[in-house]
């Protein structure tokens, strides 16, 4: 009885496979001709930087720099987003400080350096869109850039609760929940999932 059942299952499997392969045959008008790609945005997000609630001076300063340096910021984005893997491997700076020592003269950034091309380690160098924009902002403010790496989930709460962090930069999506804890700068990047 087991041999008969096994033989019947084998025959059923072969027949099913034959129909499946026939359905996929492009010449035979199979299922592949019925598939249509539709270019529809499923979700869109904006990335922005964050500052502590109530720090309107820093928020306005950063927003002003984002406006004034829009051309340079776009060039930074183009550099990274159009780069090959080999080119990405050449970017970055090993002269960026990674721990704060003089808060008044430093722009201290809380980030997670694990999201290329926005933030990433290139050997012992720190690179990425956010890092270069942070350097631009620090230069405009006349401050030394300090970048502190932490878990992604800690970036928002660190800016919210720890005074040494001036700004959070980690390809942060603008969301209502985060906006309850921190202030978002103007968006600097739009992304869409299709």
Annotate the PLM regions:
Residues 49-53, 106-113, 184-194:
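Hydrophobic/proline-rich hinge and linker segments of small-molecule sensing/allosteric domains
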Residues 86-89, 104-128:
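Short glycine-rich His-centered loop
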Residues 32-43, 135, 139, 144-194:
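Acidic, polar ligand-binding/catalytic clefts
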Residues 25-27:
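Bacterial signal peptide processing site
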Residues 1-8:
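Positively charged n-region of N-terminal signal peptides that target proteins for export
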Residues 40-87, 131-140:
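Extended ligand-binding regions for polar small-molecule ligands
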Residues 19-23:
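C-terminal motif of bacterial Sec signal peptides marking the signal peptidase cleavage site
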